[in-house]
């Protein structure tokens, strides 16, 4: 069965992608999920400088679910390029940053 898709001119092996923010760059989940089965990894947002995000509390339970406001916490582009890009490259999958 053909599972490849063309998404805005980018060929993906299949249409399954991670959700931005919840999956980091995937390294944290690699022992639980075969990341090479994904069509693409959508990374957490990254800024030009490290960003601490919002102060705690960041999560609140509400009737029917929860709310979160992490505040785009990230290590900055230098750390992302040094640590995450090599990891993403070895997956042989498309990455959306």
Model-predicted segments: where are they?
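N-terminal amphipathic alpha-helix/helix-capping segment at the start of soluble metabolic enzymes
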Residues: 1-17
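Glycine-rich, positively charged N-terminal anion/phosphate-binding segment
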Residues: 2-6, 26-93
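Short beta->alpha connector loops
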Residues: 21-25
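Conserved small/polar residues in nucleotide/adenosyl-binding loops
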Residues: 96-97
């Amino acid at each position: 069965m053909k599972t490849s898709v063309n998404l805005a001119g980018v060929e993906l092996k299949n249409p399954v992608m991670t959700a931005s923010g919840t999956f980091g760059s995937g390294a944290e989940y690699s022992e639980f999920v075969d990341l090479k089965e994904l069509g693409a990894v959508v990374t957490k947002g990254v800024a030009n400088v490290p960003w601490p995000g919002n102060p705690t509390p960041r999560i609140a339970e509400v009737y029917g679910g929860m709310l979160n406001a992490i505040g785009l916490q990230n290590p900055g582009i230098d750390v992302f390029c040094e640590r995450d890009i090599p990891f993403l490259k070895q997956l042989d999958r498309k990455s959306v940053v």
